[in-house]
Amino acid sequence: MKTVILFSFLLVLLGYLGAGHAQRDPEFTSRARQMLAVFGNSEVDRYTKSRNLPALIEFYEKYSSRLPLTVQDRNFANNVVRRYRAQNNQQVDGVPAQGGIGLAFALLLPFAKAIRE
C-alpha cells in the first residue's frame, strides 16, 4: 500500500512542479522537493520511503486543494488517506497493528496507473 501511495502522489507532485504552479509559495516548493527527493529517487530504499509516508500524507492533506487532480482522482486520494489513517489507528493489545501492505497495493495500483497515463 505504502509504495503505491507514494508513487501515486509522486506523479501528481511531479506534474504540478513541472507546470510551474509551485513558484508562488516557497514552503510548498520546498516541501514538494523534499517529497520528490525521497519518493522520486529510485535509489532510496523502501524503509526510508515508509518512514517518510506520514510526511507525504501530511503534505497531501495540507496542499490537496492546490494539486491538479480530477474529481475522481481527488476522491480516490481522499479515500486512500482515510484508509491509511484508519489502518494506522487500529490497535492490537494497545499497540498499532503491523503489516497489511498487500491490501494497499491492490487498492492503489489502478490509481497509480491512471495517473501515469
UniProtKB/Swiss-Prot annotation:
Pfam families: Turandot (PF07240). The keyword Signal applies. One of its GO terms (cellular component) is extracellular space. It is found in: Secreted. Keywords: Immunity, Innate immunity, Secreted, Signal. Residues 1-22 form the signal peptide. InterPro entries: Turandot. GO terms for biological process: cellular response to heat; cellular response to UV; innate immune response; response to bacterium; response to heat; response to UV; response to virus. Its main location: secreted. The keyword Signal applies. A humoral factor that may play a role in stress tolerance. Belongs to the Turandot family. This is Protein Turandot F. It comes from Drosophila sechellia. The lineage of its organism: Eukaryota, Metazoa, Ecdysozoa, Arthropoda, Hexapoda. The gene is TotF.
